[in-house]
């Protein structure tokens, strides 16, 4: 059995704020070590539970955070930030399941460091359904008929996953106090929880169905200001919804919608003031 792991950072236990997840800030090296250790707990249990291959995709920021020299020796790692499918790079229909580790809640909702890709996004929608990174990534997995078996992160990410994916296993390694304060498990306790939940998720795999994306989905992105919407609207095929900061794109399938999101958010970041 092949298992796919997408590993973000904001949902890792013990990381309360951006000083742990920004490579230019003081706690980053501590954060990436804990991130690597959490990934290893899940990888080790995946192999113990019968997986024959585990592919890990570093899915945070520049996507070169996981310490390959400390990673489980049997895992394969995708690292680096120029990826056609970003947080779900390398995922295809050869995988039996996916695991999302270190995930956080979507923008405009409570949760530790909650956001959706960039600071300027208020909401993502697929058709009329609000989604965050978790939802978009789960839809791409569903496009390949791959179920998301487990989501680990803060309590709000776990709740978001449970509302989105029936029977998904969740592992809440920290509880939200505010967007930059948490009650967290120690690394050892988090490791035990992740080990137990990974084992259960793999045992439970036949009860979880893929999150099937709609045919020809409409991607809508609500930005924080009109300047960001104007930049995103430079992508061919988009339009700004009248009287809003929402940019829409009619996609031929979920893969095109996902890549449109990547381009639109990249363009929106060119806005120099709010």
From Swiss-Prot:
Record keyword Hydrolase present: yes
Annotated cofactor note: Binds 2 Zn(2+) ions per subunit.
Active site: 115
Listed EC numbers: 3.4.11.-
Gene Ontology molecular-function annotations: aminopeptidase activity; metal ion binding; metallopeptidase activity
Pfam family for this entry, one: Peptidase_M55
GO biological process terms on file: proteolysis; sporulation resulting in formation of a cellular spore
Keywords of this entry: Aminopeptidase, Hydrolase, Metal-binding, Metalloprotease, Protease, Sporulation, Zinc
Binding site for Zn(2+) 1: 8, 10
Binding-site residues, Zn(2+) 2: 8, 60, 104, 133
Function: Hydrolyzes N-terminal residues in D-amino acid containing peptides. Among the tested substrates, the highest activities are with D-Ala-D-Ala and D-Ala-Gly-Gly. The physiological role is not clear.
UniProt record similarity statement: Belongs to the peptidase M55 family.
The protein's assembly and partners: Homodecamer. A 20 Angstroms wide channel runs through the complex, giving access to a central chamber holding the active sites.
Name of the protein in question: D-aminopeptidase
Name of the encoding gene: dppA
């Amino acid at each position: 059995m092949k298992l796919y792991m997408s590993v973000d950072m904001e949902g890792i236990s013990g990381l309360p704020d951006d000083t742990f997840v920004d490579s230019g800030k003081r706690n980053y090296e501590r954060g990436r070590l804990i991130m690597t250790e959490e990934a290893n707990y899940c990888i080790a249990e995946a192999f113990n539970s019968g997986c024959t291959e585990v592919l890990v995709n570093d899915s945070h920021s520049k996507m070169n955070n996981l310490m390959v020299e400390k990673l489980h020796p049997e895992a394969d790692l995708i690292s680096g930030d120029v990826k056609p499918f970003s947080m779900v790079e390398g995922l295809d229909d050869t995988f039996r399941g996916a695991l999302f580790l270190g995930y956080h809640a979507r923008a405009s909702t409570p949760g530790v460091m909650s956001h959706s890709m960039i600071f300027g996004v208020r909401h993502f929608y697929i058709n009329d359904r609000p989604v965050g990174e978790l939802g978009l990534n789960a839809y791409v997995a569903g496009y390949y008929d791959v179920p998301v078996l487990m989501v680990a992160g803060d309590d709000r990410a776990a709740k978001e996953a449970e509302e989105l994916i029936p029977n998904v296993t969740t592992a809440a390694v920290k509880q939200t106090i505010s967007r930059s304060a948490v009650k967290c498990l120690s690394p050892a306790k988090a490791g035990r929880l992740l080990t137990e939940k990974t084992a259960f998720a793999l045992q439970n795999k036949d009860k979880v169905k893929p999150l099937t994306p709609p045919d020809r989905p409409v991607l809508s992105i609500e930005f924080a200001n009109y300047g960001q919407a104007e930049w995103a609207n430079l992508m061919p095929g988009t339009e700004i919804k009248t009287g809003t900061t929402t940019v829409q794109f009619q996609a031929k399938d979920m893969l095109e919608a996902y890549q449109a999101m990547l381009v639109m958010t990249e363009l929106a970041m060119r806005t120099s003031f709010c």
